[in-house]
Amino acid sequence: MSARTPLPTVNERDTENHTSVDGYTETHIPPAKSSSRQNLPRCRNSITSATDEQPHIGNYRLQKTIGKGNFAKVKLARHVLTGREVAVKIIDKTQLNPTSLQKLFREVRIMKILNHPNIVKLFEVIETEKTLYLVMEYASGGEVFDYLVAHGRMKEKEARAKFRQIVSAVQYCHQKCIVHRDLKAENLLLDADMNIKIADFGFSNEFTVGNKLDTFCGSPPYAAPELFQGKKYDGPEVDVWSLGVILYTLVSGSLPFDGQNLKELRERVLRGKYRIPFYMSTDCENLLKKLLVLNPIKRGSLEQIMKDRWMNVGHEEEELKPYSEPELDLSDAKRIDIMVTMGFARDEINDALVSQKYDEVMATYILLGRKPPEFEGGESLSSGSLCQRSRPSSDLNNSTLQSPAHLKVQRSISANQKQRRFSDHAGPSIPPAVSYTKRPQANSVESEQKEEWGKDTARRLGSTTVGSKSEVTASPLVGPDRKKSTASPSNNVYSGGSMARRNTYVCERSTDRYAALQNGRDSSLTEMSASSMSSAGSTVASAGPSARPRHQKSMSTSGHPIKVTLPTIKDGSEAYRPGAAQRVPAASPSAHSISASTPDRTRFPRGSSSRSTFHGEQLRERRSAAYNGPPASPSHETGAFAHARRGTSTGIISKITSKFVRRDPSEGEASGRADTARGSSGDPKERDKDEGKEAKPRSLRFTWSMKTTSSMDPNDMLREIRKVLDANTCDYEQKERFLLFCVHGDARQDSLVQWEMEVCKLPRLSLNGVRFKRISGTSIAFKNIASKIANELKL
């Protein structure tokens, strides 16, 4: 993979009738078919009858749905041979037209040739006649976007650590002649160690010097001025502009360019004027002036940006340099020996690795080089469906590799630095104490498609982060001090606003694009319909009353691999945020209005995990759905986020919310709230007795979503939470011993908010905390009710 394989360049005009697939949207270079052995084998050892019922795809036991759309769904899965967690994206090829399939496979092909520690990585491709399965790593840190929503702007030291990784990864793509074209906060993921992973290569393409690209794609607030002008471009320069917007966003928590509609946004981008916050350093301001340059010819190259003073503050002896891709370790004797015990032949292993087949053999080899999943709360590795029976706590101690100097950052949550302890190909030593399951000889096929390809919308499928191939020390983590700072006006942006998700879209032809972007045609953008898979609200409110508006997610027309988190409440109602909290993917029941000062502001329809691609001619045919922006008030800065979040109102989250929705009496149903789980779950005191005192709260490593902490007994905390919920007329259902699913508001008035409250253990602080996690509803409505409840809790 170190030698770049030339990619066929897809004609930029060849994209009409494009239909996006959750994050995979551009070209047909068929991936290697999976071997016959890949027909869904099972792990023989340590499988109980319960786990036996779980569906399989290849060597992966599917567990939870973490994203779903019209043509694809994403499942959290576990590799039965190694026990590693992965994300499996299941795409129904029969629903895609030839152009969409071509783009889908181009994205897969591009992902195969990228090998950088800060870019998501593909593990395995399994293709059948009707379905494509993409196996990727699942990341637990969530999006940078969600991080900003929850915590506000980053301090420059923290932003620098992240931005160095972003620049390194993008420059690596450019040196391989690949342009991303959809760089934004939503497409930047964080792994368990808070390292950046760039995701969603659905709009990426190969570029060649002298040949211009002409597709206008990406999210408008991050789009370069030449795109708004309908000009052709080389490629890298549009990514450089987007990086400038990202840097501004990291440091300020708001966008440098924004508008109430596309016309206003276009005018501001073409002016190139943006507000410099008082707290921004001069060095950072100077770097922005190199990135956000109107003339693309004068815009700095990433090689020049790497040498910038701000980029290297604190790294004077390890100036950021272009990433040198290491030689792949294709002959790790320990991993190969383990695979032989699983039933793989040595010749088969060698052939798969040398040919880079991305089949079950290569995937197993790569996964063996990655650190095993960490189990909290004393969970045993032999439980559930794991085939890896035991794992010494020190099994990876000797596998730490030195991270590239330009990617080294320190972890702020503790005094000692913790390095990433694994590498995909320069694999760690595998301790002999770890035993793995033999590969079965007989292959059974279990179709996992019991669920229909739902039209239930999920929150954007995010992108699964994929393993780094060289070691990187952890980026700064969030500690308790960070939580406090989010409530501080000094570290929060302007009040009343909200950082909104932005739609990524495509105009293929310059004539169509030009028409769509003219002053008199700003309404053409409003004719875009909502994406086929709209996402549910997923932002996390700050830890307390904040004077800063929150980031509203940019919705892209191309989908993401997936965002990772832990399992969710139910199949079909999960999400991927850190802390194992579960999100319910579904259409948001509310149209989100952030500020009373902009009641009649039109809004971009909430996009989806797989973002629909829009073309110039399609713009004229689709109904109005205006681009949302902040009020055009002189008191608002150009970069302030004041966008409304809007979800499709076609349905409330099925399976869960039906019991909470207020019904209109005229529909023949009982008015008021339907029976709540609170009523059906029985007396809380009786339930406490029934479940016994042995149950313990789940342990969390981080305090990101903690509204409050206490030394009180968890059962007493749970009773206090119920008391406050009752006092605020909130409905709730006890999903687990210390987990409540809560609902407040009226769906008919678009004020319905759904969230989780969980009592968790914080072992590092020797305290218990209350974790809040929004599932649906506007970020402002959630923040209001969550803050009210948190303030009333007497813990």
Swiss-Prot record:
It catalyses: L-seryl-[protein] + ATP = O-phospho-L-seryl-[protein] + ADP + H(+); L-threonyl-[protein] + ATP = O-phospho-L-threonyl-[protein] + ADP + H(+); L-seryl-[tau protein] + ATP = O-phospho-L-seryl-[tau protein] + ADP + H(+); L-threonyl-[tau protein] + ATP = O-phospho-L-threonyl-[tau protein] + ADP + H(+). ATP binds at I66, G67, K68, G69, N70, F71, A72, K73, V74, K89. Residues 1-41, 377-498, 518-699 are annotated as: Disordered. The modification Phosphothreonine is found at T5, T208, T215, T613. GO terms for cellular component: cytoplasm; cytoskeleton; dendrite; glutamatergic synapse; plasma membrane; postsynapse. Phosphorylated at Thr-215 by STK11/LKB1 in complex with STE20-related adapter-alpha (STRADA) pseudo kinase and CAB39. Phosphorylation at Thr-215 by TAOK1 activates the kinase activity, leading to phosphorylation and detachment of MAPT/TAU from microtubules. Phosphorylation at Ser-219 by GSK3-beta (GSK3B) inhibits the kinase activity. Phosphorylation at Thr-613 by PRKCZ/aPKC in polarized epithelial cells inhibits the kinase activity. It is found in: Cell membrane; Cytoplasm, Cytoskeleton; Cytoplasm; Cell projection, Dendrite. Residues 523-547, 585-599 have a biased composition (Low complexity). GO terms for molecular function: ATP binding; magnesium ion binding; phosphatidic acid binding; phosphatidylinositol-4,5-bisphosphate binding; phosphatidylserine binding; protein serine kinase activity; protein serine/threonine kinase activity; tau-protein kinase activity. Gene3D superfamilies: DNA helicase RuvA subunit, C-terminal domain, Kinase associated domain 1, KA1, Phosphorylase Kinase, domain 1, Transferase(Phosphotransferase) domain 1. Residues 746-795 form the KA1 domain. InterPro entries: KA1/Ssp2_C (IPR028375), KA1_dom (IPR001772), Kinase-like_dom_sf (IPR011009), MARK1-4_cat (IPR049508), Prot_kinase_dom (IPR000719), Protein_kinase_ATP_BS (IPR017441), Ser/Thr_kinase_AS (IPR008271), UBA (IPR015940). The modification Phosphoserine is found at S219, S382, S390, S393, S403, S423, S444, S475, S588, S666. The keyword Electron transport does not apply. Inhibited by phosphorylation at Ser-219. Activated by phosphorylation on Thr-215. Its EC number is 2.7.11.1, 2.7.11.26. Pfam families: KA1 (PF02149), Pkinase (PF00069), UBA (PF00627). Residues 387-403, 462-473, 486-495, 647-657 have a biased composition (Polar residues). The active site is at D182 (proton acceptor). The UBA domain does not seem to bind ubiquitin and ubiquitin-like and might play a role in regulating the enzyme conformation and localization. Activation of the kinase activity following phosphorylation at Thr-208 is accompanied by a conformational change that alters the orientation of the UBA domain with respect to the catalytic domain. Interacts with MAPT/TAU. Serine/threonine-protein kinase. Involved in cell polarity and microtubule dynamics regulation. Phosphorylates DCX, MAP2 and MAP4. Phosphorylates the microtubule-associated protein MAPT/TAU. Involved in cell polarity by phosphorylating the microtubule-associated proteins MAP2, MAP4 and MAPT/TAU at KXGS motifs, causing detachment from microtubules, and their disassembly. Involved in the regulation of neuronal migration through its dual activities in regulating cellular polarity and microtubule dynamics, possibly by phosphorylating and regulating DCX. This is Serine/threonine-protein kinase MARK1. It comes from Mus musculus.
